[in-house]
Amino acid sequence: EKFKLLKEIGYDGVELNSPGGVDKKEALAASRETGLPIHGIVDSIHWVTRLSSPDANTRRKGLDGLRTAIRDAHLVKGSAVLLVPGAVRDAENENHQQVWDRSIEQIHWALPLAAKLGIHVLIENVWNGFLYDPKGDNNQTADLLAKYLDEIDSPWVGSYFDIGNHQRFGKPAEWIRTLGKRIVKLDVKGWGKSNGFCKIGDGDVDWPDVRRALAEIGFTGWSTAEVGGGNRDRMKDVHDRMDKHLLGKA
């Protein structure tokens, strides 16, 4: 019923969580019945069972979770897994360099499976203290994220760029221009100094410049509204806000 509702409203696809979440075979059946694709999977354990954890057993479990998400993405005919690669927690045991090194090592372990199944592993920019300065100003750049992706050096790894997440720390349109073809998918939400995370179109994001930047890099991938769900009216509002602010439709 949820797939049917989203299809009727005008959505082009959905994402699921893994490990866990809804039964993937049932979801695939619903996708086929309604014609609404499942375009990807979100790794559901990456915040707690981090690939950057100082504990080797936790990293192993995180890698197992990523591999499960990759398999589930393939099962539901998706194209990618969204991954938060780690989090900077303390200066001694999980600092920026350690998060960098450990996460890249674990991602490399997952890449043979990703390549075999044709599934991208896409890094989301989040408030994890990684690849930006959480105490810095609002003119930070995407240079570190670009460098991180380039060091992984795989056609199966790219950016799942979240437009709203780094409005506080930089200009999303400039991040888009810097990342360029590294961006494979987008997460869409609003953020503003006065209202924090908010509805798409509210807040401080310069949506016209975001649209210009996406056109400049030739972006044609999936864009996901990373916002709270709800009833038909709520989901119609989210859809219409995506159309207006991301696509520039009247």
Predicted region positions:
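Histidine-acidic metal/acid-base catalytic patches
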Residues: 1-7, 77-79, 142-250
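Mid-chain, structured segments of secreted extracytoplasmic proteins
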Residues: 33-54
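Hydrophobic residues within beta-strands of alpha/beta enzymes
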Residues: 14, 39, 81-82, 121, ...
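Active-site-adjacent beta->alpha loops and helix N-cap segments on the catalytic face
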Residues: 21-30
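Catalytic domains of carbohydrate-active enzymes, especially glycoside hydrolases
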Residues: 2-21, 75-77
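Active-site acidic/histidine proton-transfer and metal-coordination neighborhood
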Residues: 32-33, 52-161, 166-168
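Active-site beta-loop-alpha junctions enriched in small/polar residues
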Residues: 17-19, 43-46, 86-88, 119, ...
